[in-house]
Amino acid sequence: MPHPDTTSDKPHKCAGSPLKRCLGKGVLAVGVCMLASAGFVLHQSKAYGLLERIHHGLIICTPGTGLSMTAASAGLARQSSPAMLRLELASQEDGRVIVMPGSSQLSDVLASSRRAHTLLMLDLNNTNPADVAALVRKARMLDRVVLVSSSRETTETALQADPDLLVAIPIHSVRDAYAAHRMAGTHPYAAYLSPTASPNLFTLVHRDAEAIITENPATPALSTEEFLADRPVDIVVTPQPAQLTQALAGGS
């Protein structure tokens, strides 16, 4: 029988090594869980992005305000199409960007929109595109916003404001389509077409633009379903989103 003193240290050695291994495995497991959680959060965030939601179907956009945003987005959320609101922006004398009508600050509206997973189409009007882009980036809404301008100069400024922010470029002809492609360069852009544009023009701009925006055709001669069947459209702007959704559901 071995002397007790000769074996007294052995249990400590045997117990210590598995303990270290267990601790190491525990740390590794925690790290894996954290990475998995981060990946899940990132995936969920991307799922709410504009371009990702375009792949899942037509996006219906309706005019809204900073004050009515919550109610409007809640109403759209009950419909089959993703919710998108078109907001008019303005600059105050103190430099703050607000949503009209009303005086809601764009920063607050962006924060609310992110929580509600609401997409936004922002009309720049007289605002500085760089200021708007900075607010959008700070709110982590770059992938959920598209900027709209009525002038070429403001459009060019918006394209330079942030390389990751989608900018809508008005296109009325084949010449405009090629000019928009040259203007944007490597910057992602959306093409904003009139509903009276030809199906061929829609098809042409679809080759280069990240998204195609148009308005609901107000003509009894052509149903919305027929209109969309001949044109690649990603976003339809309409003041009557419920009627448009019902029309599309009735035709399917």
PLM region descriptions:
Residues 2-252:
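Phosphate-group recognition and catalysis centered on beta-loop-alpha active-site segments
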